[in-house]
Amino acid sequence: MNILLFGKTGQVGWELQRALAPLGNLIALDVHSTDYCGDFSNPEGVAETVKKIRPDVIVNAAAHTDVDKAESEPEFAQLLNATSVEAIAKAANEVGAWVIHYSTDYVFPGTGEIPWQGGTDATAPLNVYGETKLSSEKKALQKHCGKHIIFRTSWVYAGKGNNFAKTMLRLAKEREELAVINDQFGRPTGAELLADCTAHAIRVAVDKPEVAGLYHLVAGGTTTWHDYAALVFEEARKAGINLALNKLNAVPTTAYPTPARRPHNSRLNTEKFQQNFALVLPDWQVGVKRMLNELFTTTAI
């Protein structure tokens, strides 16, 4: 099997390089690649890459993911998140390739308390990022490439690079008091979990093309940013890390205004994914604790 990966150096892309390698011949690209174009600001270039390589599977982990910055550069966000995805979808259809693509809970309005159902619940993005990702689903893949799998996910983290836990730990060493948002609900999902589930889904799809479609892929359970931070601090103290923090306050979203609106409810219903791919998605704490353990034992916090 020949697999083409876009966005190899991002949080998810890095884990995908590991998870996809056993499936066959992997060609992994990013914006700086020179042998083939992996630059999503060049739709014609990435489409030409697909036509030259003629892969069996394309995995797209490239995106404009700066949610707040997207508000001030909507055209650029649309170019990276939708226009180039459409170009890839058309080229993939020409060569008969599967396309695996990642989307977001931000396609929903973020209201209520019930996990969003894929395919039945109405979409209504709150921000530019959500609009561009919804466009990548509907106007690109669903329109131009039948052999696609779209994974909507949320609250993605990885041990590589910056993440929420590292930021909280840094602040907790510097300050005695912190205030963290407690009215946004979601499921922290590790890039490692996304990559492993993607590799499994590809193996299933190759043998059962009827699994093509839209899925929600997040870890189990539910938390808030405040409770997520509380877990991070609890695990840090268990590991013997000294924190200056002695008070953690819960505050509403309005306490931290941002250019892009954030949803109150980022919960996603994953029943369809678990049924079609015969997998169980572990509770969010499992992955976060694993990431923290690796962080505590391999680096100085």
UniProtKB/Swiss-Prot annotation:
NADH binds at G10, Q11, V12, D30, D39, F40, A63, H64, T65, Y129, K133. GO terms for cellular component: cytosol. Binds 1 Mg(2+) ion per monomer. It holds the Pfam family RmlD_sub_bind. Keywords: Carbohydrate metabolism, Lipopolysaccharide biosynthesis, Magnesium, Metal-binding, NAD, NADP, Oxidoreductase. The record marks T104 as: Could provide a fine-tuning to achieve optimal pKa matching between active site and substrate. It catalyses: dTDP-beta-L-rhamnose + NADP(+) = dTDP-4-dehydro-beta-L-rhamnose + NADPH + H(+). Homodimer. This is dTDP-4-dehydrorhamnose reductase. Pathway: Carbohydrate biosynthesis; dTDP-L-rhamnose biosynthesis; Bacterial outer membrane biogenesis; LPS O-antigen biosynthesis. Belongs to the dTDP-4-dehydrorhamnose reductase family. CDD domains: dTDP_HR_like_SDR_e. The gene is rfbD. It is an enzyme of class 1 (oxidoreductase). The active site is at Y129 (proton donor/acceptor). GO terms for molecular function: dTDP-4-dehydrorhamnose reductase activity; metal ion binding. One of its GO terms (biological process) is lipopolysaccharide biosynthetic process.
